[in-house]
Amino acid sequence: MRFVDEYRAPEQVMQLIEHLRERASHLSYTAERPLRIMEVCGGHTHAIFKFGLDQLLPENVEFIHGPGCPVCVLPMGRIDTCVEIASHPEVIFCTFGDAMRVPGKQGSLLQAKARGADVRIVYSPMDALKLAQENPTRKVVFFGLGFETTMPTTAITLQQAKARDVQNFYFFCQHITLIPTLRSLLEQPDNGIDAFLAPGHVSMVIGTDAYNFIASDFHRPLVVAGFEPLDLLQGVVMLVQQKIAAHSKVENQYRRVVPDAGNLLAQQAIADVFCVNGDSEWRGLGVIESSGVHLTPDYQRFDAEAHFRPAPQQVCDDPRARCGEVLTGKCKPHQCPLFGNTCNPQTAFGALMVSSEGACAAWYQYRQQESEA
């Protein structure tokens, strides 16, 4: 397949691995204290495990997993609010498939559906808007979540709902922004992060300039990378080269997709519909300043929380779970005492095991047999 196979060619992968090993031999990092590269994107995490890239790295270079999966950082209280809204008999509650099994204290949306709530999986917010137009006597609520990657499609859908004057369409907002989260990670003492592989999809929207503070303020190199083996390995080589040269700058490996300025039309749609300045709670990480998203005044009438006025939900994470440590790269999934036992894909305890982009789900799928051995 053109534009895919060439980025997975085994011969080129092995050549790049050999080049990486040669370059890494010049690093001051050791097997005991390797160069820790945080891959921020859940798509990167799954690609790394699927293709076994973590096992091909030199012993003095290591991947650590970051909070790049928006479903994985859904607070339990927000799921409980979703369940409460979905339980209204006049509501059709729409969301993406990944969110269906995320557990809250009052159960998941899938369990709410089993109890009789009208909860439906959609593939796009436009599908939810179409449902609203087809069911004028029902109240259709779209549960929007994700980083800047999915915000433009939500914004355009709300623009369409406003233009068409759809009165029975509502939006429950759980969009969050990536940049404040990276800053919050780096402000933690002893964060152990030496470099970043930044997500291609988010960067396609926000561009590369948004990351400059990581190099200038925190002196960490960052490379925006694609999702195929050669993309990721080339990104690692670029980071190793920066470390050898004692440089800290932002580089773009994924130039075939990501312009440095990002997608200006997408940014305009986001700015029209969303205020990107509120605080937001992240599961396992607490409240992160300025990472939340709210509707602008012109779109307030679509706000599901303002319309249904659900009771505020504050649910503490179980102290046995190490979700927050996995999300910040401080431990590996299999080091959590619940991993593979209480928490598995069939009976997930945490969202990291539920989402198709979660680090725990990836580890369970691709590394579980090794952990048991």
From Swiss-Prot:
Superkingdom as given in the UniProt entry: Bacteria
Disulfide bonds: none
Pathway: Protein modification; [NiFe] hydrogenase maturation
Result of changing residue 69 to A: Can no longer coordinate CN(-1) and CO. Reduces iron content
Stated role: Involved in the maturation of [NiFe] hydrogenases. Involved in the biosynthesis of the Fe(CN)(2)CO cofactor. HypD may act as a scaffold on which the Fe(CN)(2)CO cofactor is formed. In complex with HypC, accepts the cyanide ligand generated by HypF and HypE, and also coordinates the carbon monoxide ligand. Required for the formation of all three hydrogenase isoenzymes.
Domain note: In addition to the iron-sulfur cluster, contains two additional oxygen-labile iron ions.
Binding partners and assembly: Monomer. Interacts with HypC. Forms a complex with HypC, or HybG, and HypE.
Name of the protein: Hydrogenase maturation factor HypD
Protein species of origin: Escherichia coli (strain K12)
